[in-house]
């Protein structure tokens, strides 16, 4: 699958992978700084942003998408940073295509299964009949009863776009992602350990990585 992407800077290639409900644009708070030393490439993963929609979605498929992206951009190997869902894609990519990854950084994600935590968000978004709304503010207000966080609502609504008739549509394949959501919580398909330097970063208030995860981390990523 050909992935939409943006790029900036010069130097060694650095590929940034975004999280669930996100897009490559989420990285532009830090990308310009990274671009002072690296050639930064920021793809939208399948079913997100401006990349193609597909009925199937899991980590081996997304890792294969990234490998094809490397080939299309003539990248032999690169540093890879992934956040959240993108962190799992980055880990799967490193395990499946180790020669493609020089160094790996995983932000707020461990190589284990996670219980569903976004069902309420999917239900709230899928319940919206977008053709009934004229403004983003109206949509945000309609979500407020189900999604209390203003910052989260605004993040989710970055997925809105308008079609040729000026009507709101989702850029991401919302229903497709929802139908594959259980697969996104699954444990990685582990082959041989990834032996290159790896860094795991945990948010100070996050429980996505905990002390119990260190065994699995060091088993699959011994240089972490």
Task: List PLM regions with ranges.
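Active-site glycine-rich loops that stabilize anionic/oxyanionic intermediates
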Residues: 11, 19-23, 84, 204
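Alpha/beta-hydrolase fold catalytic core
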Residues: 1-15, 35-38, 75-76, 221-223
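Alpha/beta-hydrolase active-site loop signature
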Residues: 21, 45-49, 111
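Conserved alpha/beta-hydrolase catalytic His-Asp/Glu region
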Residues: 116, 131-188
């Amino acid at each position: 699958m050909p992935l939409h992407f943006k790029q900036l800077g010069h130097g060694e290639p650095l590929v940034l992978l975004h999280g669930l409900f996100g897009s490559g644009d989420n990285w532009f708070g830090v990308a310009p700084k990274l671009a002072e030393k690296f050639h930064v490439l920021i793809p939208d993963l399948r079913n997100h942003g401006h990349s193609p929609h597909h009925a199937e979605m899991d980590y081996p498929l997304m890792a294969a998408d990234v490998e094809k992206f490397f080939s299309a951009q003539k990248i032999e190997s690169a540093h890879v940073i992934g956040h959240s869902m993108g962190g799992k894609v980055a880990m799967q990519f490193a395990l499946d295509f180790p020669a493609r990854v020089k160094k790996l950084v995983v932000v707020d994600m461990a190589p284990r299964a996670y219980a569903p935590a976004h069902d309420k968000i999917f239900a709230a978004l899928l319940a919206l009949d977008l053709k009934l709304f004229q403004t983003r503010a109206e949509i945000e207000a309609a979500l407020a009863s189900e999604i209390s966080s203003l910052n989260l609502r605004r993040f989710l609504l970055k997925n809105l776009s308008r079609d040729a008739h000026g009507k709101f549509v989702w850029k991401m394949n919302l229903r497709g992602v929802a139908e594959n959501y259980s697969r996104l919580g699954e444990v990685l398909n582990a082959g041989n350990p990834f032996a290159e330097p790896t860094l795991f970063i945990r948010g100070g208030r996050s429980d996505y990585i905990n002390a119990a995860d260190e065994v699995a981390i060091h088993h699959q990523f011994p240089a972490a």
